[in-house]
Amino acid sequence: MRLPIILVSPARAENVGAAARAMKTMGFTEMRIVASDAHLQPAARWVAHGAGDILDGIRHFDTLADALSDVDFSIATTARSRAKFHYYATPQQLLPMLEEKRQWVGCAALIFGREDSGLTNEELELADVLTGVPMVADYPSLNLGQAVMVYCYQLSALMQQPPVENVAGDGQQLNALRLRMAALLHRLEVADDQKMVDWVQQRLGLLEQRDTAMLHRLLHDIEKKLPE
């Protein structure tokens, strides 16, 4: 399973360099950047110190949605609670989650937001799972480079495992399930209940492969019973 690190609108070249260095140290190889050219500044390469190959391989995108176009499962980091988001995985909880996903997902991604404001609610909604680092309240944030290091360290075991031969098409099960669920809620005329819609969408990413397949079967049976 590929696991690119996505930085959304990083402002400081030094932070991009620090993130690249953290990735290199822990065995990660692919970085994507959204709406920023900070990685092109000399300071990024100076701080990267030996991780120039990661900077050289950076893929740039205009939007986060574009950066996720080939991603089957995405995890977004956030440092603060948003009222509409209720479940946050810790970095430690992500490892078993991704170890299960790697059996059927070809590409996952870990997303980091802006240094000053993080990810917008609209960007967080693009992710399958949200995660945050529990911290002491009087010092409630990590800088970008530190945050990337924390997550890369926690997930480094994934980089040491041999690749898994994925079943064709399985990686798209989650996205297909999201679309199917949204369509069903619309047919049931409950799509305007935003609280319920948010609750459903936030929990689909937590499903394992067997659960995802079973829910597809259940939705299929429900769809057959509904009038056209």
Where are these regions (language model features)?
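Post-transcriptional modification and biogenesis factors for structured RNAs
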Residues: 1-228
